[in-house]
């Protein structure tokens, strides 16, 4: 088996013992072992959850096996074992600047992005990217949003980045044009959040509250989970506070603080 390690991860004594036991008792048919990765939210990382399973141990050689008694085919999905081993992520600083610089170099060299890397780039921008980094990435994601070959999920992710970048630049027309693409069908929390932010900054608290409500209750987030949870709930509290509706403001403030 091959263990995939990061330079900033730590395995304490208890989990080293669990790992030793796992290696001694691992069944040969297991091809991937997943382990919990903890402390992910430190330093504003790209992740939405502080603890989640990740594939960490991989079988070196994997042979195909025939399955099903009729219409036989080979099994394509690996045999995965979810262990209770927990690795602690202990970065000494934020990696966002480094990661975004690598993505920017890939764009300059016109390298292709896998769906996974495309999603990671969009996540890094929405969770940790500043105004400058968003402006740098705007053309790349605009092309993706306009591209006829872009997969539906990546299209939605591109819209989230373009809408935020355009809003921060003050390009209201572009922001609104791409936002409307993102609120059709089921809608996207990130886009509703950006529209709420636009109207909030204009001090149009009634209109802003509509979009914050949509972000929190009518849509789902795809990149930053907080845009569908505590962020719009807290903004709803601020909107109702500005409108003089104290009880509503108090209720949403409580919901925001208790959101997990």
Question: What would you call each of these model-derived segments?
Answer:
Residues 142-146, 183-184, 215-220, 257-258:
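Amphipathic alpha-helical segments of tetratricopeptide repeats
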Residues 107-114, 144-155, 219-226:
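Flexible helix-coil transition and linker loops at the boundaries of alpha-helical arrays
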Residues 128-131, 169, 202, 243:
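Structural motif corresponding to the intra-repeat A-B loop/turn of tetratricopeptide repeats
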Residues 1-13:
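Short beta-strand-to-loop acidic/aromatic patch adjacent to the donor-nucleotide binding site
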Residues 11-132, 136, 141:
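Catalytic-site signature of metal-activated, phosphate-bearing donor transferases
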